[in-house]
Amino acid sequence: MTEPVVTRFAPSPTGFLHIGGARTALFNWLYARKQGGKMLLRIEDTDRERSTDAAIKAILDGLNWLGIEWDGEVIYQFSRAARHREVAEQLLAEGKAYRCYATPEELTKMREAARAEGRAVRYDGRWRDRDPSEAPADVKPVIRLKAPQTGETVIEDQVQGRVVWQNENLDDLVLLRSDGTPTYMLAVVVDDHDMGVTHVIRGDDHLINAARQKHIYDALGWTVPTMAHIPLIHGPDGSKLSKRHGALGVEAYRTMGYLPAALRNYLVRLGWSHGDQEIFSTSEMIEAFELSGIGRSAARFDFAKLENLNGHYMRASGDAELVKAFEDILQFLPQGPALQAKLNDTTRAQLLQAMPGLKERAKTLLELIDSAAYIFADRPLALDAKASAVLTPQVRALLGELRSSLANVTDWNAANTEAAMRAYAEKNNLKLGAVAQPLRAALTGRTTSPGIFDVLAVLGRDDALARLQDQAA
């Protein structure tokens, strides 16, 4: 019987959950769900100077917002330091590791000499076979692994294929620092083993770590997990992802008005494919996800593609669902408190009524909020420059007449207000646009808006007529 699949997402809490980390978490989660296994969450907080509680909160919030659920309690790596030291001492006792008394000055000279000679920088093993009796009394040692010095180290990677390193190019890595704290390399191996991790899915910037970590696994006689090193995400031009390209924290995408389902769908297609399918529900992702579908080349981040995909999800979302999303995002926006204060039973009902038209036009929640601004506008409306230019004295006189025509509409809805407008335009030999544009400017303060008949219906008779009165001559 095969053992159950256990994956892990193991971020360092030194910053927000960036977009590459979010994709790594998603791939781990999808693979675990596809295989009926578990995804664990381990916070690698051994760098005590750079790890922050704010970053931990941002990581947990980001995963929750994206709908990526981990199994069990969050594991904090630093809390396991005693276990890591125990393993280092075990290797020392078994003769598979040794105390190294090289001073920082010696190591600096070693590095400088290697660079001057054009050699790779690596520890030269000077304390590997020396008698401990030669140890200087005033130097606290580190503990180093006795790595193999000949032959090769091979990783059969599920994405990169067979990757081979010559052992002569890999040095004796530090397991325990001179202050007794474990290194990242040791902590990761011990934690993955103790947590029963069967598959390590992470960025290919960790590929060299895989070779070095395999040396630790082999020294301990532990099974090496299946490895899958996924390509990094690049900008649209193929360069390293920068903030202008999209190298932002997940919380920034939330604030920019993207829906979690859309971002999840976009991320799964960054470097993974399943035929030519672009749109995936969560259940479809889980059903289709295989490590073999991950490509070896870097994926390119494309904001326009994300925006279009988000637009698709906006249009496919239920109206009430979008009203909730509208409210949820306000806490993250500068104008949020002012809008929140205006949300009441009336404006919520208007927003829900307007939503079919709003979501057809908006690609993000920010665009949706902007298009819905007329619902929350205070009278008399502030007009933008284009709307002011439309409302000439002659047009303002027209608005007064148009208001009188609309005031005769008893059953106030989009169809009846449209009929009244068309009748007015026909009676006065005007094109519909010559009536609709001034109406739009007076009702919304802008020259672009959702369908003007929908605007009339959403505002209701009293508010619409009052806004027209405000602008009429």
UniProtKB/Swiss-Prot annotation:
Keyword Metal-binding part of the UniProt annotation: no
Pfam families (alphabetical): Anticodon_2, tRNA-synt_1c
Keywords: Aminoacyl-tRNA synthetase, ATP-binding, Cytoplasm, Ligase, Nucleotide-binding, Protein biosynthesis
Record's subcellular location: Cytoplasm
Binding site for ATP: 243
Family annotation (InterPro entries): aa-tRNA-synth_I_cd-bd, aa-tRNA-synth_I_codon-bd_sub2, aa-tRNA-synth_I_CS, aa_tRNA-synth_I_cd-bd_sf, Glu-tRNA-ligase_bac/mito, Glu/Gln-tRNA-synth, Glu/Gln-tRNA-synth_Ib_cat-dom, GluQ/Sye
GO CC field: cytosol
Gene Ontology biological-process entries: glutamyl-tRNA aminoacylation
Alphabetical list of Gene3D superfamilies matching this protein: 1.10.10.350, HUPs
Molecular functions per Gene Ontology: ATP binding; glutamate-tRNA ligase activity; tRNA binding; zinc ion binding
Subunit architecture: Monomer.
Family statement drawn from the similarity comment of this UniProt entry: Belongs to the class-I aminoacyl-tRNA synthetase family. Glutamate--tRNA ligase type 1 subfamily.
UniProt function note: Catalyzes the attachment of glutamate to tRNA(Glu) in a two-step reaction: glutamate is first activated by ATP to form Glu-AMP and then transferred to the acceptor end of tRNA(Glu).
Name this polypeptide is given: Glutamate--tRNA ligase
Organism: Afipia carboxidovorans (strain ATCC 49405 / DSM 1227 / KCTC 32145 / OM5) (Oligotropha carboxidovorans)
